Amino acid sequence: MNSKLKKILYPHQLECLNASLKEKRGIFILPTGSGKTYIQIAIGLDDILKKKDNNESGIYVVNVPRILLSYQILKEFFEMTNKFEVPCDYLIVHSGTSIDEDGLLNLHNENLPWRDIRVTTSTEEIKEEVEFSKKNKRPLIVIQTYHSAHLTKSVLNELNLPIDVKLNDECQYMVSEEFSNQIDDKSAIKQFHFTATAKNANVIGMNQKDKWGEKLYVMTPREAIDRGIIVPPRMIVSTSLEDFSEEDLRKSFSKIVYQDWINLKKLNNKVSNKLLIKTRGTDDMSNFIKSKEAKELIQQGVHIFVIGSNKRVDNWYNGEVYRRPEWLELLKSCGADDSKEVICLHFDILSEGIDVPGFGGVSFFNSPELDKFVQNYGRSARLHKQDRENLKKGLITTDNREDWVKPYSYVIVHEYNDINKSQSNTIYEMIENLREYGFVPERDITIEQVRGISENEEMEDLLDDDSKKVVKGKLIDDWLIKYELESEKTASLSNDRFDTTDEVVIEYFNELFGDEK
């Protein structure tokens, strides 16, 4: 293992790198926010540095589910190889737009030659890049979507060249009929899979060790919380003073987002807040963009980001539409700026490993499946940079969060009276399991119902039924916090308007999360 690389990794990342040196196949399961991307980079870079010492080079492939994620992985890999002064060639294989060269030039080591980075789906161009790198004995790092991976594979098969290290990010997407042929790639000398949410299934599920290899490293969300790698969730259940239906909620969506924002600011007043909104689909986002609430928030200085594959939404920021890589850079820049307030609305695309710092809360408008809940929660579970430094210095601890800048990830849910409060109950159960049992997020699926995603495919829209797009119902007033689960072991009740059923639930919460004797 490279000694310089060893010094910059956190202990759990170093454990993962050590595990990869002992095996040629395997799965790494770590919660969102724990730095899986840097583990992947470390595995690839360690092999690159070893070959460099022997005047050799190799081919390194990183597979991702989305075009947007590929640009982020490229930037982080590029930054690390330039810090280590390793001249590498890069190739992006998917149908997306060109890269942001200005952003990469800011990271470029002047002692290394600059070479333009192609974004292509042409096998001829892929072949040219592979042959150039081999001729000049330079490592080639290919970052591609699962949807386009077959193009690179066909070129390497034609040239009879192996992949030295293959890294499958968000590998749960390989558990599909479309991408299953990529699981056990015999042309890869080493192949490792990374996920926060394992998927089990017959024949090709991640429980099939003969195809995926052993689980080389598993960290539960609870363990990550206890080790100070991510912050714990704090659940906020909101409701109105009167009963309302889903139609009322749909009509009042923008108003409720505005109130979620106000509530988060009241609860989390140590920082400039950043809230991620998990919507039900395009209609929610499109209606919000046009709403007076969005205009008011922008006038107040809040940075509003909305993203979707549908042209009605696109990559929207404060009234303007941007190219996706530029939109992501703007979001990351605002996310990293402690002085800026941010609200970001999405349906699914930000769930898949997009690393945006700063989110302190996430608001759900539907009950996601377990893996989607963990991914969205993970977007807001990253440590504040000041807390990370204070933990290193021993100034704060994980068992006393009073002095933390960001002690929790605030998870906001909304009770739907006409469907028996199923959303808040479902998410509460997920949080309970995460806190109490340190579960490994896995989901069993029936493979006949699962196919791969296209790199540009519009995800399922919960409002795609035309009959559901008619905005009916009444506007909801007097939105309030009903109760909040304050920490792993205590429940704080912030309102006394409860009926008999609620009192039973509250009693159960107090029994479950009451102080330990």
Predicted regions and their residues:
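Conserved pre-motif I regulatory segment
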Residues: M1-I29
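Conserved helix/coil segment N-terminal to the catalytic DExD/H
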Residues: T123-P162, E177, N181
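Walker A/P-loop
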Residues: E23-G44
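Post-DEXD/H (motif II) to motif III coupling segment of the RecA-like Helicase ATP-binding lobe
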Residues: Q172-P233
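Conserved Walker A/P-loop ATP-binding site and its immediately adjacent core
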Residues: I39, E56-T81, E85, D89-S98, ...
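Conserved RecA-like P-loop NTPase helicase motor core
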Residues: K311-P441
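Conserved interdomain linker/interface between the two RecA-like ATPase lobes of SF2 helicase motors
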Residues: E214-S286
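A conserved SF2-helicase RecA2
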Residues: A224-V231, Q386-A491, N495-D499
